[in-house]
A protein has these predicted regions:
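C-terminal amphipathic/interface module of NAD(P)-dependent oxidoreductases
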Residues: 260-292
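Alpha-helical substrate-binding/gating segment
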Residues: 176-186, 191-225
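NAD(P)H-binding glycine-rich loop region in Rossmannoid oxidoreductase-like domains
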Residues: 35-40, 45-90, 96, 102-103
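Mid/C-terminal beta-alpha module of Rossmann-like enzyme folds, strongest
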Residues: 205, 209-260
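Glycine-rich Rossmann NAD(P)(H)-binding loop
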Residues: 7, 164, 187-192, 218-226, ...
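N-terminal Rossmann NAD(P)H-binding glycine-rich loop of SDR-like oxidoreductase domains
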Residues: 4-24
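Conserved beta-loop-beta element that borders a ligand/cofactor-binding pocket
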Residues: 143-166
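Conserved Rossmann-fold NAD(P)-dependent oxidoreductase catalytic core, especially the SDR/UDP-sugar
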Residues: 82-138, 155
């Protein structure tokens, strides 16, 4: 991989991916709306595109070639379709960042638990996919379009809940702040288990997928997982303060991790490619200390 196009990539683990590519000597082009400032300096070429308008991508990519495209900003099968059509004949490998939300709730979900070759996508604009169910349908449909139609090798990465100091969603920070301020955390069931991955591993495996020219779907997560109750317990210990957990969930106190069921991933397939994930306990403890 000598050249790479990143669709998105100016936020969260997308930024880490760009830096890893640059450190490896890859010539990087970043295509975004041009609204978010980045710290890449003169190290990358920048293109301005609108993911929801195929003609803007067709113009931007005209006459260009890249070894690999990393699609970090696709939120509907329509966007997967228009991006691929604008890039057809211009790339050698398509890597799409999907989500563990393609799976139904359950423990140790394997890649085979959702088969995009059997899914029939509906082509709608991203705003037409509402809520968690809509998000799941949109990402499933995007995967389905690429695997069913792309004439180049496709890799799809399905990250667990991504955490890190660079998480602009502040979902993890929400819990740290609530414990620190002794404010209530709303959750109807704090015993369900879920998987995390670090922003370092999310970027690291994406880089690995391009370097090794992987194909197919891969889960990304720490090997271990824990419940919301266990997570809050770790924050309590580090902050030396008791948490206030309530089943009376409001808009203000609702935990972003207040899931209705278990949601954990099996990462055996990813590990078999030679990638080693970080240690969950060490990472979470370190992250809590940094956020307190």
């Amino acid at each position: 991989m000598k050249t790479a196009l990143i669709l998105g990539g100016t936020q969260f683990f997308g930024k880490r991916l760009v830096h890893k590519l640059l450190e490896d000597g890859v010539i990087v082009t970043v295509a975004t709306r041009g609204r978010t400032r980045d710290d890449f300096g003169d190290g990358v070429e920048r293109l301005v595109i609108d993911r929801e308008k195929k003609e803007s991508m067709t113009r931007a990519f005209e006459g260009r070639q890249w070894d690999t495209v990393y699609d970090q900003s696709c939120f509907s099968p329509l966007e997967a379709k228009t991006a691929y059509e604008a890039l057809e004949g211009k790339i050698g490998h398509y890597i799409f960042t999907s989500t563990m939300a393609v799976y139904e709730f359950g423990k140790e979900r394997k890649e085979t638990d959702f088969d995009p070759l059997l899914f029939d996508p509906t082509f709608k604009h991203r705003k037409e996919y509402g809520g968690m169910t809509g998000y799941q349908e949109a990402k499933r449909g995007a995967e389905a379009y690429l695997f069913q139609n792309a004439k180049v090798p496709v890799a799809v990465v399905r990250p667990a809940l991504v955490i890190g100091t660079d998480d602009y969603t502040e979902r993890f920070l929400f819990h740290v702040d609530k414990v620190k301020k002794e404010e209530p955390i709303g959750a109807k069931n704090d015993d369900v288990s879920f998987s995390f991955t670090s922003s370092e591993d999310a970027a690291g495996f994406l880089f690995h997928a391009g370097k090794e020219r992987l194909t197919g779907a891969y889960n990304i997560a720490f090997e271990d997982n824990f419940s919301l109750r266990e997570l809050i317990g770790r924050i309590e210990s580090a902050a030396d303060k008791p948490a206030v957990i309530t089943g009376e969930v409001t808009k203000e106190n609702a935990s972003p991790y207040g899931l209705p069921g278990d949601w954990t991933l099996d990462v055996t397939k990813a590990q078999m490619t030679g990638y080693s994930f970080g240690n969950m306990n060490e990472y979470v403890e370190s992250l809590i200390e940094k956020l307190l």
